[in-house]
């Protein structure tokens, strides 16, 4: 394993590790109580396992997900990827990184959510993002060699001090309504990891990783796949360590029922409260600055990864517009949304993500299956169409626009996984139909 692979792996870790990835584990640790281990292991399985799978599957075809999705349908490939890139990019995730950075770095210092302060902060924030993203070939070096080490050092400092401060406490009782047995805790952790929706970002980041591997001089598809897998495993190990560590500390932090009730009444995020408490207990008044640095670095690396991924994709489908022009357009969009109407955008984006996410996971699994089992195009199209339609009706029913009893009665509906057994049945149906349809088996392009 060479230095380049390590740098790519750490870059991938930094791009995945956004502010939300800091907040989820300690919150899960607190809620899981005596059933911490089944909950956190299940969280790791879906919260890290699915994104890792998403990254490495993108390396099966020399054209990445563009080539793999074209095997299902070229029109579907373009539409699906445009929706994914815009939703996790300038219309949702990138503006959120800026606003989250402001709320956790500047707001605690000025004790105000000043719109002027937010405006100034986001100008500086996106200038830095612009500088890093204008040359995508240097993204890996700038993030993997500089920003990631800073991020890891600051996180490790907080984890070590947090462990020393709180590990001596016994685990709290947790949320016994959700975590009352090994099975229920595993199921809840599985669902929470799934709901991070990082698997969608994996489709975007896969292109960056594959391109970075190619820049090292590797051209054969099987070697690209191996290097992508290795880089993905490096990122996964780092994420696993941090998730379990933060979750364990959260599991041993003493938080009274009164405090929890007060936080809920003020609509404050409990995970943010736990992180703030961890930092202030360990480092006093400096703790809020340390946490601010961690959040800013985590958000910045994620924003850079998303800007590069989105811009490269749109430049690829509209080559007449330069990559740098797309970078400027998407940064400007993100800047405007970060300062105006972010809550409205989030409320609109979540239903879209809830529709796209099951389709994305289904697509990843179908591509993986087709690598090892001869698969016809119709055999992939049928489950994708069925899962897509089901996801639309699931969101409609969940939003209360129309109560659909069939959807509500599906297995795993309580865990937002009702699409999964349907996807399995649809995949079997697709393969049965494929037996009677004259099509050549799908072959992913090799060098």
From Swiss-Prot:
Role noted for this protein: Component of the transport system for branched-chain amino acids (leucine, isoleucine and valine), which is coupled to a proton motive force (Potential). Contributes to NaCl tolerance.
Keyword Transmembrane helix part of the UniProt annotation: yes
TM segment ranges: 6-26, 40-60, 74-94, 114-134, 143-163, 193-213, 229-249, 290-310, 326-346, 350-370, 382-402, 417-437
This protein's UniProt keywords: Amino-acid transport, Cell membrane, Membrane, Transmembrane, Transmembrane helix, Transport
A GO biological process held by the record: L-leucine transport
Family matches, as Pfam families: Branch_AA_trans
GO molecular function list: L-isoleucine transmembrane transporter activity; L-leucine transmembrane transporter activity; L-valine transmembrane transporter activity
Protein name: Putative branched-chain amino acid carrier protein SAOUHSC_01411
Provenance organism: Staphylococcus aureus (strain NCTC 8325 / PS 47)
């Amino acid at each position: 394993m060479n230095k380049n692979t390590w740098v790519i792996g750490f870059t991938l870790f930094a791009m995945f590790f956004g502010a939300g990835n800091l907040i989820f584990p300690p919150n899960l640790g607190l809620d899981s109580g005596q059933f911490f281990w089944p909950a956190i292991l299940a969280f790791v399985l879906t919260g890290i396992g699915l994104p890792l799978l998403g990254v490495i599957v993108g390396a099966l075809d020399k054209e990445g997900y563009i080539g793999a999705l074209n095997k299902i349908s070229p029109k579907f490939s373009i539409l699906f990827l445009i929706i994914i890139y815009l939703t996790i990019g300038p219309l949702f995730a990138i503006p959120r990184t800026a606003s989250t950075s402001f709320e956790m770095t500047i707001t605690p210092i000025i004790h105000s959510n000043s719109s002027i302060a937010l405006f100034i902060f986001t100008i500086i924030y996106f200038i830095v993002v612009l500088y890093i993203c204008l040359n995508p070939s240097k993204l890996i070096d700038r993030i993997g060699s500089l920003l990631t080490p800073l991020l890891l050092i600051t996180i490790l400092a907080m984890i070590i001090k947090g462990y020393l401060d709180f590990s001596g406490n016994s685990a709290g009782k947790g949320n016994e309504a959700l975590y009352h047995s090994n099975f229920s805790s595993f199921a809840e952790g599985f669902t929470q990891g799934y709901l991070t929706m990082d698997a969608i970002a994996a489709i975007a980041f896969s292109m960056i990783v594959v391109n970075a591997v190619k820049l090292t001089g590797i051209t054969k598809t099987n070697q690209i796949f191996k290097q992508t897998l290795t880089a993905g495993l490096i990122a996964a190990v780092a994420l696993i360590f941090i998730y379990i560590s933060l979750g364990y500390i959260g599991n041993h932090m003493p938080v009274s029922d009164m405090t929890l009730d007060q936080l809920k009444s003020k609509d404050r995020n409990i995970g943010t409260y736990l992180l703030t408490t961890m930092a202030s207990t360990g480092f006093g008044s400096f703790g809020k600055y340390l946490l601010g640095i961690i959040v800013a670095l985590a958000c910045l690396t994620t924003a850079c990864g998303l800007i590069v991924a989105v811009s490269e994709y749109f430049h690829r489908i509209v080559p007449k517009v330069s990559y740098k022009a797309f970078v400027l357009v998407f940064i400007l969009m993100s800047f405007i949304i970060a300062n105006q109407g972010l809550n409205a955008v989030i409320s609109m984006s979540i239903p879209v993500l809830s529709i796209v996410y099951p389709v994305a996971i289904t697509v990843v699994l179908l591509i993986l299956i087709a690598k090892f089992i001869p698969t016809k195009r119709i055999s992939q199209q049928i489950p994708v169409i069925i899962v897509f339609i089901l996801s639309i009706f699931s969101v409609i029913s969940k939003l209360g626009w129309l109560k659909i009893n069939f959807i509500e009665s599906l297995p795993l509906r309580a865990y937002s996984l009702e699409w999964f057994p349907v996807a399995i049945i649809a995949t079997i149906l697709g393969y049965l139909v494929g037996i009677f349809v004259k099509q050549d088996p799908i072959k992913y392009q090799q060098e």
